């Protein structure tokens, strides 16, 4: 190896991302492990597990079978050892795609009662890389943080009276798009002209 030049700058411009800034897809393998953990500990009828922001948010979709089923899934997932830096755990019903952040947020906005659907776990173990641990706590060896458990499922005890979701299936959506394509494209062009977007 031959070194011909070394370049140096006193105040470099670094185009990197801050710690834990999402760089892309979450680690799929960890969510497979969370799903296996749920099943191993008796949480049945899980229909999907996914995460966002490098897994800091874990979403569990399930078909509720009994009162407390969603809470059981949340507590079990929060106790998963490899989930050390995961902070937010959300359960959604099986009609929500856990890989679609818009659907998850919609469920949170329409099915969560902040007074009764959210629980905080204090002093949960975390990794020494977790930026939320203060320097004083880190020095004392206190590697604990809180975790938020969010039940974004329809309330089990009155789910039959809960308003139904009104959603087109993908097949119905394609039929409408095919039938009305010209009109939809004209409307989109008008909208972009009004907003100044080209």
What are these regions (language model features)?
Residues 1-198:
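Charged, compositionally biased interaction regions
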């Amino acid at each position: 190896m031959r070194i011909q030049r070394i370049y140096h700058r006193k105040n470099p411009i670094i185009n990197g991302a801050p710690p834990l800034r999402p760089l892309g897809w979450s680690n799929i393998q960890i969510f497979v492990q969370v799903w296996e953990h749920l099943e191993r500990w008796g949480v049945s009828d899980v229909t999907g597990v996914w995460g966002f922001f490098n897994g800091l948010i874990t979403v569990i979709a399930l078909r509720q079978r009994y009162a407390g089923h969603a809470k059981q899934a949340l507590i079990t997932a929060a106790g998963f050892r490899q989930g050390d830096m995961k902070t937010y755990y959300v359960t959604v019903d099986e009609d929500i795609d856990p890989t679609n952040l818009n659907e998850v947020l919609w469920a949170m906005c329409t099915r969560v009662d902040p007074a009764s659907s959210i629980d905080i776990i204090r002093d949960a173990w975390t990794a020494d890389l977790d930026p939320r641990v203060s320097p004083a706590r880190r020095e004392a060896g206190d590697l604990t943080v809180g975790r938020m458990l969010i039940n974004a499922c329809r309330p089990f005890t009155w789910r039959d009276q809960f308003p139904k979701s009104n959603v087109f299936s993908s097949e119905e959506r394609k039929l409408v798009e095919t039938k009305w394509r010209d009109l939809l494209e004209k409307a989109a062009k008008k909208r972009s002209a009004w907003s100044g977007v080209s």
